[in-house]
């Protein structure tokens, strides 16, 4: 994976007890944690409180991972449009998830680059672009909360390990807390 980029924005609903990071970002942080499957090294975050109530209503989080993987999350209560989209770019393919799309929620692109080292005196690195097909895998339509509850019940009944265990929840909370600390310090990098 090269990068993970997520946008979760809409107009409201403003919360009175948490900022936009704690309200909207946990979803994308948990997806990021599962997909990247590595522990983030550090986080930076910036945000703004436009209403003057002490709670950020717009925020940008950047997580840094080993091997130069970067993840970016944008959350916002002041957007005129509702966007729920994630892009993941890797060495072989690229994925775009759009939760607002009624029929094509996931698109897989066979696009990418290949770095070619040369002995040429002018250019010592060349970039070759690969453009292939795009396809939309059929994803069964399920209610997310019902699926989660069925999985939880199955783990209890069959004594199996859940997809998202307590450690995954802990990692999400650590990133949320570090993001809040970074926002309060004007984007200071916080080691995890």
Predicted segments — roles?
Residues 25-29, 99-100, 145, 149, ...:
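A structural signal for well-ordered alpha-helical scaffolds and beta->alpha junctions
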Residues 50-53, 67-147:
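NAD(P)-dinucleotide binding in Rossmann-like oxidoreductases
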Residues 137, 146-147, 151-192:
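C-terminal helix-rich "cap/oligomerization" subdomain common to oxidoreductases
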């Amino acid at each position: 994976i090269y990068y993970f980029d997520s946008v979760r924005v809409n107009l409201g609903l403003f919360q009175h007890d948490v900022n936009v990071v704690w309200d909207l970002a946990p979803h994308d942080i948990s997806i990021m944690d599962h997909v990247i499957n590595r522990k983030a090294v550090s986080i930076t975050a910036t945000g703004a409180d436009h209403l003057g109530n002490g709670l950020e209503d717009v925020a940008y989080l950047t997580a840094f991972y080993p091997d130069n993987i970067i993840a970016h999350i944008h959350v916002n209560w002041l957007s005129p449009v509702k966007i729920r989209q994630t892009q993941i770019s890797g060495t072989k393919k690229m994925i775009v998830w759009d939760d607002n799309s009624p029929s094509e929620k996931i698109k897989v692109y066979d696009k990418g680059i290949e770095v070619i080292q040369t002995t040429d005196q002018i250019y010592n690195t060349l970039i070759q672009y690969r453009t292939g097909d795009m396809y939309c895998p059929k994803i069964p339509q399920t209610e997310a909360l019902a699926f989660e509850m069925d999985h939880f019940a199955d783990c209890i009944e069959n004594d199996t390990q859940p997809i998202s265990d307590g450690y995954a929840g802990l990692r999400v909370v650590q990133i949320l807390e570090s993001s809040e600390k970074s926002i309060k310090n004007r984007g200071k990098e916080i080691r995890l």
